[in-house]
UniProtKB/Swiss-Prot annotation:
Keywords: Cell inner membrane, Cell membrane, Membrane, Transferase, Transmembrane, Transmembrane helix. It is found in: Cell inner membrane. It is an enzyme of class 2 (transferase). It comes from Stutzerimonas stutzeri (strain A1501) (Pseudomonas stutzeri). Its main location: membrane. Pfam families: LGT (PF01790). The chain crosses the membrane at residues 10-30, 56-76, 87-107, 120-140, 172-192, 200-220, 230-250. The gene is lgt. This is Phosphatidylglycerol--prolipoprotein diacylglyceryl transferase. It is a multi-pass membrane protein.
Amino acid sequence: MLPYPQIDPVAIAIGPLQIHWYGLMYLIGIGGAWWLASLRVQRFAPEWPKDKLSDLVFWVAMGVIVGGRLGYVLFYDLAAYINQPSLILQVWKGGMSFHGGLIGVLLCSWIFARRNGKSFFELMDFIAPFVPIGLGAGRIGNFINAELWGKATDVPWAMVFPTDPQQLARHPSQLYQFALEGVALFVILWLYSRKPRPTMAVSGLFAVCYGIFRFIVEFVRVPDAQLGYLAFGWLTMGQVLCIPMVLLGAGMIAWGYRREAGRAPA
């Protein structure tokens, strides 16, 4: 068993002002994605002035934060937030939904694309390779918060999390997700997108890979207490949301390549 590193969730405290690691991880993720996007933006939109990428990052960040929080409220714990709406603003305590954040990003990106005369799907293909940076940073934030831990296990790398009332050795599922949704997904998308691909192929690959990775990790992750398992004694809300994501992503890839083949000269 590995010891859980005792990390104060508050990274910086200046008087009554507290800056939490959870929030810092989101800033690091957004900043890292911004920097990587700046390396490729000229290939995607050579006509853009320098501040246009900043505008895009702002819109995407708003989609992540607002969509992620509202998605968690709607998908995972609606009753609690209806009873105490002020909890919605307490984002430093955790409670962000990837699928809600994805919906928020899609909506904000659609608005941005319309305003700037860009194809929505081409914009999604540009954004997709940078998303794992934010996902990975967010999972580290979950780990520091000692939340979203896994099931009890006897694997050598199991950990006892201080927030676990049972104090059992558990899978560090946040680190599994960091490795898959952050590192592995970034490598796959970064390498795949180095060459021109059919429209929707890169974003479709993101949807497929994320959905598969998340579906797998959910088997060792403890479901949200207020929901539990939805069916069969193992199906979680995260898995339910990933199934249409994988199917849609596969359809996007197939459609993109079929459309590209139809354009090829005979």
